[in-house]
From Swiss-Prot:
Subunit note: Homodecamer.
Entry's Gene Ontology cellular component terms: cytosol
Keywords assigned: Carbohydrate metabolism, Cytoplasm, Isomerase
Protein family (similarity comment): Belongs to the RbsD / FucU family. RbsD subfamily.
InterPro entries in UniProt: D-ribose_pyranase, RbsD-like_sf, RbsD_FucU
Purpose of the protein: Catalyzes the interconversion of beta-pyran and beta-furan forms of D-ribose.
Protein name: D-ribose pyranase
Major enzyme class: isomerase
Subcellular location: Cytoplasm
Originating organism: Pseudomonas putida (strain ATCC 47054 / DSM 6125 / CFBP 8728 / NCIMB 11950 / KT2440)
Enzyme active site: H20
Length: 132
């Protein structure tokens, strides 16, 4: 059995296969998943799992060079943004896009991880870095 916090097989596989510059999106329950992009659906009920818990576990395994957020998140300030601020040392450089442009970016993702989060704009695109 794995010794690290991430136990989900599909998510472990995607992270293990990511290279420098690859994108992994963690999204709320309402974020659309573009056709052709793998969906890793963790949502079981509204609020479970929450965005922050999934982000913390993903960051235990993924080296992140930069991250992208929707500009609209700044106006709503969901709990997700509070957690992102807390973890900013593990997230690299920050970029902002409109929510519509964020959805366009998600077309390039290796996968979209759907959480049970129901706070608006609780989405992040993680761009993989290198450990050397």
């Amino acid at each position: 059995m794995k010794k690290t916090p991430l136990l989900n097989v599909a998510l472990s596989r995607v992270i293990a296969g990511m290279g420098h510059g690859d994108i992994l999106v963690i999204g709320d329950a309402g974020l659309p998943v573009p056709p052709g992009v793998e969906l890793i659906d963790l949502a079981i009920t509204p609020g479970l799992p929450d965005f922050a818990s999934v982000l913390r576990v993903v960051l235990s395994e993924l080296q992140v060079e930069r991250h992208v957020l929707a500009e609209e998140m700044q106006k709503v300030v969901p709990p997700a943004l509070v957690e992102i601020e807390r973890l900013k040392g593990k997230l690299g450089k920050r970029e902002w896009l409109t929510h519509e442009d964020f959805k366009v970016l998600s077309r390039s993702a290796r996968a979209v991880v759907r959480t049970g989060e129901c706070q608006p704009y609780s989405n992040i695109a993680l761009i993989s870095g290198v450990t050397f």
